[in-house]
A protein has these predicted regions:
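Short N-terminal amphipathic alpha-helix/helix-capping patch enriched in small hydrophobics
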Residues: 46, 55-58
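Short recognition patches in nucleic-acid-associated and regulatory proteins
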Residues: 70-81
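The canonical Cys-X-X-Cys-His
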Residues: 57-66, 93-103
C-alpha cells in the first residue's frame, strides 16, 4: 500500500503543477500571457468603436497633419489664419488662449477648455490631404509610446476617462450661429467602456491594408 501511494506522488505533483499553470495563465498570474482569441476579437471590435470617435471632427480637428487647426464638421481651416506654432498653442499675438478660455463661450460661439491646444504632429490622425488615416494607422500611432507621451494601456484608459480636452468633445458648446456642435457617435461612457475592453484585450491593432 505504501509503495502504491509513493508511486502516485509524481503523478499528483504533475497534476497540481499543470493545474497551477492553467489557472495562472487563465487569470493572469503567469508572465506575459497573450489574450485569448475571443478576447482579441472583442478588443479589435472595441477599437473600431474608439476609431469612430477619434476621427470625428470634435477630435480630429485638433489632431491634424496641417500647420493649423481645423473647424466645423466639414473641417475647414481655422479662420484668421491661426497657425500651429512651436508648441501647438499658436504664436505670439495669435495664440490659442487669446480666444479660447477655460470654458465654452456660448454667447460668441468660441469653444473653450483648459489648456486649449493642438495635438502634437506625432498624434496626427489624418494625411496631408486632410483624409483620416486608416484604422490600423491611427491604432499604431495611439499605441506607440514614442509618439503618445509614453502612455501604456492603463494610461490611455485614464486619458480617455479624465483628460479635460477629451471630455470637451461631449460638451462642445454652441456654434456662432447658436446651433449646437455635433458630438462623437458614442457617449463618453460608451467610449470609456470600449477603451477598457480594448486595453484589457492587450490594445490589439487591425492589420495594415
Amino acid at each position: 500500500m505504501l509503495r502504491h501511494r509513493t508511486a502516485l506522488l509524481p503523478s499528483l505533483f504533475i497534476g497540481l503543477l499543470a493545474t497551477r499553470m492553467f489557472v495562472g495563465g487563465a487569470f493572469g498570474y503567469g508572465g506575459d500571457v497573450k489574450p485569448a482569441p475571443d478576447s482579441r476579437a472583442d478588443g479589435l471590435a472595441a477599437w473600431e468603436q474608439i476609431y469612430s470617435v477619434l476621427t470625428h471632427p470634435r477630435c480630429i480637428n485638433c489632431h491634424t497633419a496641417t500647420n493649423y487647426p481645423q473647424q466645423g464638421d466639414e473641417r475647414h481651416r481655422h479662420f484668421a489664419n491661426v497657425i500651429r506654432g512651436p508648441a501647438g498653442q499658436g504664436v505670439a499675438g495669435l495664440n490659442c488662449a487669446s480666444c479660447h478660455q477655460e470654458t465654452n463661450a456660448d454667447s460668441t460661439g468660441v469653444p473653450g477648455g483648459p489648456g486649449w491646444h493642438l495635438a502634437p504632429l506625432s498624434m496626427k490622425w489624418q494625411d496631408p490631404n486632410d483624409r483620416p488615416l486608416s484604422s490600423a494607422e491611427v491604432c499604431r500611432a495611439v499605441t506607440d509610446r514614442s509618439k503618445n507621451e509614453n502612455m501604456e494601456g492603463r494610461a490611455l484608459l485614464k486619458h480617455h476617462e479624465e483628460a479635460a480636452l477629451v471630455l470637451w468633445a461631449w460638451n462642445p458648446g454652441r456654434r456662432p450661429d447658436g446651433t449646437m456642435r455635433t458630438m462623437p457617435p458614442l457617449t463618453h461612457a460608451q467610449f470609456v467602456a470600449a477603451t477598457r475592453t480594448w486595453v484589457e484585450a492587450g490594445t490589439p491593432c487591425p492589420p495594415a491594408k
